[in-house]
Amino acid sequence: NEALRQALRDYHAPADLFLVGEQVERDGETAERQALMRQWEKDGHHLHNHSYSHPAFSQTDLAAYLANVSRGEAVVEGLRDSDRTSPAYPHFYRAPYNDLGGSAEKYQALNAALSKAKVLPAPFTLHNHDWRFEEAYSKALADGDQALAQRISEAYLQQLQLEFDFAEQLSRDTFDREVPQVLLLHANRLNADHLGAVLKKLQERGYRFVSLQQATADPAYAIADGSQGTSGISWLHRWRKTLGQPDRLGEEPPFPAWLEKPAQ
């Protein structure tokens, strides 16, 4: 956590954190974990709900899922600055696996519940498979293979560039301009070691770092989500579906094939 926070401080980058409630409420560790999350908010970052136990919506009963979302929101609400010494901010919810239920009924029920709670669905426009790189990276470190860990790190940063090349071009092809990008990352060892390098590369591409609230103020984010599916495709692809534009999902940069074996 400290390495992530330091990298964000170094690049003056605000982060929006999506918390799984049961990972905050741990026997014998709850108070310590709550204090850590509150420190993130004191640093100027925003805390949001990612459910209580990370269920897949399409594989969970609707009532049980909505109860899980509500329970997760209660955990996060208990962490937010009750004294409001920091500015208030909109609350977002990111569905685990970005699984939106797989049916219109479930999708609409979730949106209705979020709207009633004054919580917004959280979009993203790109990711760089960080959780998959993390599997290989952590295994290499556990095996003491520093050379492989370094090679994975380099591939990870190269993947970042490929993902941004694609997302920027897809934005131009969709809107004739570049919309603010929302990068999905996970708190893991890989990013603890390399978030500074990630932010440096984005800064070199000309990006400035803003909150999710600021990014989603762009008119593109008001376009309806054209997908009710179970997979975590980016909102650029979802908007294209809504706008009736050709599917470009198959053009996404592939995950490096050579990494599949080390990650096993």
Question: Which residues does each PLM region occupy?
Answer:
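Active-site beta->alpha N-cap acidic-glycine motif
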Residues: N1-N98, S103, L183, K201
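C-terminal domain-boundary segment and adjacent tail
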Residues: A15, E25, P123, R189-Q264
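A mature extracytoplasmic/lumenal domain signature
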Residues: L19-Q23, S51-S53, Y97, T125-N128, ...
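Short low-complexity, flexible loop/linker segments enriched in glycine and/or proline
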Residues: A31-R33, A63-Y65, A136-A140, I223-Q228
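Short, basic, helix/turn surface patches
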Residues: E41-N49, E73-R80, Q146-F164, I233-F255, ...
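Glycine-enriched alpha-helix->loop->beta-strand junction motifs that scaffold or abut catalytic
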Residues: D43-L47, S115-L120
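Alpha-helical scaffold elements lining the catalytic groove of polysaccharide deacetylases
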Residues: P55-D81, S103-A117, T125-R177, N191-H194
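Generic beta-sheet signal
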Residues: V179-L185
